[in-house]
């Protein structure tokens, strides 16, 4: 089966396509995404932003489309950066700038529990059908570790692996990640509707 994905983040797209290959699902990027004026993400929750994007971009897709909103919630910062994760250090902030600001705001605080959250919204012809949420718990390190991943991955320590998400390969991370969990929920939903699970 084929489903379209609306994301301009190459790291996210790689993860979604990797999962799709394993499950024999063709995850296609929405053609011409860069030329489409992006909607303003004014939601206060991941669910609101994912739904807003999915409903909007599905109007440009020839079939079912999903969009996600993902971020990091740090307990000691009251859940920040949350829905502002990608622009924590300002509009068009780099991963490095966001990571540096996060470490600065946490300082030496010993309470470093955090979670990655991903909400995927499925839509077709401008209508949101359902949302799917995935979370993974961890802690924020005092410095970045590992060359892999993207975003806050090098700062996110995952106890069962004994390392940061920046130190594990893509398939291993996706097995336990927030995005992997949310995408599997989406695929299970599609199968429950009786849609074919193969191309």
PLM features: residue spans?
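Anionic-ligand binding patches
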Residues: 2-4, 10-199
């Amino acid at each position: 089966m084929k489903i379209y994905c609306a994301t301009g983040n190459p790291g996210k797209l790689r993860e979604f396509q990797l999962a799709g290959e394993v499950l024999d699902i063709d995850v296609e990027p929405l053609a011409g995404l860069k030329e489409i004026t992006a909607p303003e993400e004014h939601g206060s929750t991941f669910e609101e932003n994912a739904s807003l994007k999915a409903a909007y971009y599905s109007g440009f897709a020839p079939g079912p489309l999903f969009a996600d909103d993902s971020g990091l919630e740090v307990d000691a910062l009251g859940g920040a950066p949350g829905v502002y994760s990608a622009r924590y250090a300002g509009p068009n902030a780099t991963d490095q700038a966001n990571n540096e600001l996060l470490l600065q705001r946490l300082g030496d605080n010993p309470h470093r529990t955090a979670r990655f959250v991903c909400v995927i919204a499925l839509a077709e012809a401008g209508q949101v059908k359902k949302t799917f949420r995935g979370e993974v718990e961890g802690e924020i390190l005092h410095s970045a570790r590992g060359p892999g991943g993207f975003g806050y991955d090098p700062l996110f320590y995952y106890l069962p692996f004994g390392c940061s998400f920046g130190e594990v390969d893509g398939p291993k991370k996706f097995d336990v990640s927030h995005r992997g969990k949310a995408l599997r929920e989406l695929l299970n939903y599609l199968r429950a509707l009786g849609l074919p699970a193969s191309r």
